[in-house]
Regions:
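Acidic-leaning, charged glycine-interspersed low-complexity segments
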Residues: 92-144
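Oligomerization/assembly interface segments of phage tail-like spikes and tubes
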Residues: 63-81, 88, 131-142
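Short, solvent-exposed beta-strand/turn "edge" segments of beta-rich domains on protein surfaces
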Residues: 58-63, 127-129
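Small/polar-rich, solvent-exposed N-terminal microdomains that initiate assembly or binding
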Residues: 1-59, 95-108
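Generic alpha-helical secondary structure
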Residues: 5-10, 78-81, 85
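Intrinsically disordered, low-complexity acidic/polar segments
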Residues: 55, 80-82, 145
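Charge-dense, low-complexity intrinsically disordered segments
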Residues: 2-3, 75, 125-128
Length: 145
């Protein structure tokens, strides 16, 4: 099964915005018109890193997909980058008080459902000039719903 990566990515961006209260660009810096905070630091950038499929062979529509996303949080200070990354981590991994549901749902297009989420890799913080970046990779497991 191939899932619509761009549509899934847009749903993930909306989840990051809900959790962080900051703008998130799609493979680029958010524009000054991006909601809720434009291109002001801190902000997030989401990159699609591809998808793999599992389950039934030969492109069966009932197969599952694992989509990989990188989120780079950019801030003017180490604290801003780190706390922004904490909010992104909460967006992907946060659970409700009873642990039964995700704290921040990823609302997918009709016909798809999130089965799971995981932190794939956390590269941590780097600095270039006076700009700090914190890089994380997350996997989102999707099935037909």
């Amino acid at each position: 099964m191939s899932v619509p990566g761009r549509q899934i990515a847009q749903a993930v961006i909306q989840t990051i915005i809900a959790a962080s209260g900051r703008s998130c660009g799609y493979a680029t810096v958010p524009t000054s018109q991006s909601q809720p905070s434009g291109s002001q630091l801190p902000y997030h950038v989401l990159y699609e890193l591809g998808q793999t499929v599992s389950g039934p062979p030969f492109g069966d529509p009932a197969a599952d997909a694992r989509l990989l996303f990188q989120v780079t949080t950019v801030g003017a200070s180490p604290d801003a980058a780190s706390s922004g990354a904490d909010r992104v981590r909460a967006a992907f991994l946060g659970r409700t008080a009873h642990g039964a549901d995700w704290l921040y749902p990823i609302t997918l297009p009709a016909g798809y459902a999130v089965m799971g989420r995981e932190l794939d890799r956390e590269d941590g913080m780097t600095v270039a000039g006076s700009t700090y970046s914190y890089v994380q990779r997350f996997a989102v497991h999707v099935t037909t719903g």
